[in-house]
Amino acid sequence: MTIFDNYEVWFVIGSQHLYGPETLRQVTQHAEHVVNALNTEAKLPCKLVLKPLGTTPDEITAICRDANYDDRCAGLVVWLHTFSPAKMWINGLTMLNKPLLQFHTQFNAALPWDSIDMDFMNLNQTAHGGREFGFIGARMRQQHAVVTGHWQDKQAHERIGSWMRQAVSKQDTRHLKVCRFGDNMREVAVTDGDKVAAQIKFGFSVNTWAVGDLVQVVNSISDGDVNALVDEYESCYTMTPATQIHGEKRQNVLEAARIELGMKRFLEQGGFHAFTTTFEDLHGLKQLPGLAVQRLMQQGYGFAGEGDWKTAALLRIMKVMSTGLQGGTSFMEDYTYHFEKDNDLVLGSHMLEVCPSIAVEEKPILDVQHLGIGGKDDPARLIFNTQTGPAIVASLIDLGDRYRLLVNCIDTVKTPHSLPKLPVANALWKAQPDLPTASEAWILAGGAHHTVFSHALNLNDMRQFAEMHDIEITVIDNDTRLPAFKDALRWNEVYYGFRR
């Protein structure tokens, strides 16, 4: 069972009574056939539920009102099978607060050249019914997604499925609670921000709990539960000699397991699905949570270090989007560079907290090594390299008057040399279009040093996310040129300034 099993998407057909009962009967029959086929064959992440025809303003308004108040409804897919006068949709769309997609399709793929008549034309009017619907969306300044293609087309299936992921993610975000264990890393700017504005814009709440509250739960974990979890570690990971039974760091592993169990219990009891820690606020914990955080991220929790609640929330959101897709998604940080002509590279990592979902190794190494930052006992961590291939890094920043999402398309590569003295998980990548352009554009746009790294999601996914939440997006990819990028930043400043 996945999060998508908790939601459904309503399939709504727009028509009118102008064409008579026989046409409406055929419309209903076609709709039932299409919905059944999509649910059976399209591999959509969640179920489509066919709703009664929307043929009058009252019917359409009732559907939209019901969608708002049904917690299982993640959004609406609308098909204008015949012409559906768009003034009928105004009241419903005015109140609708769920994501909306127009499926611009028709029942037949090919025209029946020899038999086509006006009855056929009146029945199959998506071509101009969809345009009427599009006008009212534009007139109302209500942006909605549009997917064009025959309902049996695999590309259309993939695009609808991608939109569904965004719709479910948006509903999950409205209920997302972010727990901050301690506050921000002191004096850091980009990890701070307006939590009230974030809750208004995205729906997630951010609150702080004292580390002492967490410590109390950690200390309540039984030795039996700790030993059982360590048994799981031994089956899942390659344990270094120091972490094995009778190893000199075995106690550190036991303590890491206790912290993991305590953290998970605290998060579950509070209904949290994202959290932050900071190495400056660890009072009562014996070590900085590393292994615990890595494993919780792999289970779907959002996380970021140093109190960075925006990145923690974004990671949870992207984890939901990517559920069931190939590739992993993790907290990440641009750490250091490799400058070499035509082969500039970025080494990404963090002190400890990189999600094993992006690991190339089937069994990462579990080790305990010294960490100078934080002033605590040596922490346990998983060490691994990252899968290669196309990926993205994304950053959500607070500009005061708006949120900006930055996305850099990257290509992860194999580490050319071993890193025997680097005791943390890492990722190595080439930034698009090149490191100078990518880094300068990122810096000019105010991108954070913390990001969400993903092999599972792509630029189109993040564009949809930005559109669905009505926030600015700036893209750095192979098409980026700095003069045009700077111009776009200036234009965006004017555009969003007018919208205030």
Swiss-Prot record:
Q: What is its EC number?
A: 5.3.1.4
Instruction: Give the metabolic or biological pathway.
Output: Carbohydrate degradation; L-arabinose degradation via L-ribulose; D-xylulose 5-phosphate from L-arabinose (bacterial route): step 1/3
Q: Which Gene3D superfamilies match?
A: 3.40.50.10940
Keyword Ligase present in the record's keywords: the answer is no
Biological process GO terms, please? L-arabinose catabolic process to xylulose 5-phosphate
The secretion signal range is: none
User: Which reaction equations make up its catalytic activity?
Assistant: beta-L-arabinopyranose = L-ribulose
The record's free-text note on cofactor binding = Binds 1 Mn(2+) ion per subunit.
Q: Which GO terms describe its cellular component?
A: cytosol
Listed cofactors = Mn(2+)
InterPro entries named among the record's database cross-references: Ara_Isoase_C, AraA_central, AraA_N, AraA_N_sf, Fuc/Ara_isomerase_C, Fucose_isomerase_N/cen_sf, Lara_isomerase
Give binding positions for Mn(2+): E306, E333, H350, H450
Question: Which enzyme type, at the first EC level?
Answer: isomerase
Any GO molecular function: L-arabinose isomerase activity
Keyword set, alphabetical order? Arabinose catabolism, Carbohydrate metabolism, Isomerase, Manganese, Metal-binding
The organism's superkingdom is given as: Bacteria
Q: Which family does it belong to?
A: Belongs to the arabinose isomerase family.
Q: What job does this protein perform? A: Catalyzes the conversion of L-arabinose to L-ribulose.
The UniProt subunit note reads as follows: Homohexamer.
NCBIfam families listed in its UniProt record: PRK02929.1 (NF002795)
**UniProt name for this protein:** L-arabinose isomerase
